[in-house]
Design a protein with these regions (language model features):
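Cytosolic regulatory regions of ion transport systems
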Residues: 1-650
């Protein structure tokens, strides 16, 4: 996305805006809010104390100057004689006394001083204690939020770090961008974790508050009514029940249906019920299901995981909705070749429904918007239908005989069932899946009698020794190996460490001679995005980074709720889906071809091309080789291993 102007999603992507007049906080409330946020940081506390000392010093100097400027209260100078009385006067002054004429007055003065010190110390201690308790309360994040147009995140999970990074990119051109995080963790914990795991947030200001996300009284402190959008994170420990309770608490505090609520949900029925009960205000993201689908499809389509992450992040081309009157009366097939710097992927109909990769003969009617991938919304410029390209010769898709495939899955979690359900839809008849899982992490009973369509599933409980892997890997000539993390059985860091160890062991077996293990395509799931660079060292073919994938979806929908049905269609088991196909199915190898010609060929196959993946560009400094939305006029020479990224049917 271009950094030259504020972020936009095109002409009315979300329909006519509903304008509400937020209650403006008073000047006193703003000053208290700024003081609360600054005093919560130890460095700012020292700064405030220094400022107060300077102010008091200036006041004292002014008072002294005024007093000495008044002759009727200033004594004339007298000669100083050194004697006991002079000594006593100086000594007593140290205790705030002096000037007593008799010893009786002096003794009484010292007794008075002692009482004053005792009482003053008690009062001072009480005041210091009260101030300390006030600072502790501020540090605990109990003060209210007065920010407007902020993104409100309720709850806490590992997805919060990549979400913040994506929101920072999305709002890089937004003045005073704010994210408020409200969870049951302490303020110190949240700020320390964010500082350690989500650095370089640019101009994005993150405000943290502590409280119960399911308690309406606590939520009143978050200024929900003036939030731009709300994100409800699914804690792995509490699950959907906590998300439902949080949504109910939000509705109790703020019945305004104009603020979209993006939630993480595991159960599809729960998600559908929430969306229906709130008339579409709640948008559900079934993170685990989408991660499982991408993992399954990545095992079938090399490079798909990289394409998905490239499409979803804010640092590059994005999806926009644009009204193009010149296309009214023309077909979707015409629209695909009508934009030089944008890739059309679907239509937003006048009734609000979306159609991703509709039939090529679909007629564009008044009020219909184009859904396109572009660098920015001002790049979605109609350049006319390319009739010369549209009539180009069609390269027939190579028809491949369906041959039974054999997959090895190492590791297991509840997500494994969704992966196999997805694989069962397109694996040829007679295909097999062998599951190898460590018995200390997975109950063998959980793997018994698994049935997924016509796939033959077997399993083995192992100890994790490399001999177990050798035994499993040499059993058959596997077409794919999928490594799943032991999510929920152990911590994320332990699960990722186990996954990376398995990847290293498998690559060692691939390189060794005489062990009966043939080199095989390796797809792995990493739970923590911080481990992705380490995981790539293991030479994995495709890496599915779970928390990044989920976070990207949540951040995208939070910034633009109109994208929700588009992503739902792309990642649903039915309908259009992302595919990475051999480029030889669309153009001859070794001959220069323009991207417009590839788009035309894909169009004639009922697909919408959005980019390509160069085999020569993968692996170098973490590069994925993915090129999304190249100019239609750009040309390159395809080689073996290159792929075309299209949206079509399985």
């Amino acid at each position: 996305m271009s950094n030259k102007q504020e972020r936009s999603y095109g002409q009315g992507a979300q329909g006519e805006p509903t304008i509400s007049t937020p209650a403006k906080p008073s000047l006193g409330a703003k000053l208290r809010y700024s003081f609360d946020n600054s005093i919560a940081k130890s460095g700012m506390f020292v700064t405030w104390m220094f400022v107060l000392m300077v102010i008091f010093s200036i006041l004292l100097v002014l008072i002294k100057s005024i007093l000495f400027a008044l002759p009727f209260i200033t004594h004339p100078e007298t000669a100083i004689e050194f004697n006991f009385e002079t000594f006593w006067g100086s000594f007593a002054t140290l205790f705030g006394k002096g000037g007593e004429a008799t010893w009786a007055e002096r003794i009484l003065g010292f007794l008075t001083w002692a009482c004053t010190v005792a009482l003053g110390g008690s009062v001072t201690g009480f005041i210091v204690g009260a101030i300390t308790r006030t600072f502790d309360r501020l540090r605990k994040g109990k003060s209210p939020i007065v920010d407007n147009n902020h993104t409100l995140i309720l709850g806490w999970s590992n997805r919060i770090y990549p979400i913040l990074k994506e929101l920072a990119i999305a709002n890089s051109n937004v003045r005073k961008a704010r994210v408020v995080i409200f969870s049951n963790h302490t303020r110190d914990y949240m700020e320390d974790e964010i500082e350690a795991r989500a650095k370089d947030l640019g101009k994005l200001k993150v405000v943290t508050r502590t409280g119960d996300v399911t308690n309406p009284e606590d939520l009143k402190r978050t200024n929900i009514a003036n939030a731009k959008s709300i994100i409800v994170l699914d804690s792995d420990e509490t699950g959907d029940a906590n998300v439902v309770s949080t949504v109910l608490a939000i509705k109790a505090v703020n019945p305004n249906t104009n603020i979209k609520i993006v939630t993480e949900i595991d159960d599809a029925n729960t998600g559908e019920a929430l969306t229906t009960a709130t008339n579409g205000q709640v948008i559900t993201v079934r993170s685990h299901e989408i991660i499982a689908r991408v993992t399954a499809q990545a095992s079938r389509r090399p490079g798909l995981a990289a394409v998905v992450l490239d499409l979803l992040d804010f640092d590059g081309d994005e999806i926009y909705f644009t009204d193009v009157p010149a296309l009214v009366g023309k077909t979707y097939a015409d629209a695909i070749l009508a934009f030089n710097e944008a890739c059309v992927i679907g239509l937003l109909n006048a009734d609000g429904t979306t159609s991703v990769n509709p039939a090529q003969d679909t007629v564009i009617t008044p009020g219909t918007k184009i859904i396109a991938i572009a660098e920015d919304d001002d790049k979605v410029v109609y350049t006319g239908v390319r009739e010369d390209i549209a009539k180009s010769k069609v390269t027939p898709l190579a028809k491949r005989d369906e041959v039974a495939e054999h997959l090895l899955i190492i590791g297991w979690s509840s997500m494994g069932r969704t992966v196999l359900n997805e694989l069962a839809q397109f694996l040829p008849k007679g295909s097999t899946v062998h599951i190898v899982a460590q018995s200390r992490y997975v109950d063998p009973a959980e793997l018994a009698n698994l049935k997924f369509g016509e796939i033959n599933v077997s399993y083995a409980s192992v100890t994790g020794d490399i001999d177990d892997l050798i035994s499993a890997a040499k059993d058959k000539n596997y077409d794919e190996i999928i490594v799943l993390g032991y999510r929920n059985a152990i911590s994320e860091s332990e699960a990722d460490a186990q996954t990376m160890l398995t990847m290293l062991q498998m690559n060692q077996l691939f390189k060794a001679d005489g062990n009966g293990v043939e080199p095989t395509r390796l797809v792995a799931e990493i739970l923590d995005s911080r481990k992705s660079e380490l995981a790539r060292v293991a030479a994995v073919d495709d890496l599915v980074v779970s928390d990044s994938l989920a976070a990207l979806l949540i951040a995208q929908i939070s910034e633009n709720p109109a994208l929700a049905p588009v992503f739902e269609d792309l990642f649903d088991a039915e309908g259009a889906t992302l595919n990475v196909r051999k480029i030889s199915d669309y153009a001859p190898i070794g001959k220069s071809v323009s991207f417009a010609e590839l788009v035309a060929t894909a169009r004639n196959h009922g697909e919408s091309a959005i980019g390509y993946r160069l085999a020569s560009g993968t692996g170098a400094e973490g590069s994925t080789g993915v090129v999304l939305n190249p100019a239609k006029t750009s040309e390159f020479i395809p080689v073996e291993g290159d792929s075309l990224v299209v949206i079509g049917n399985l």
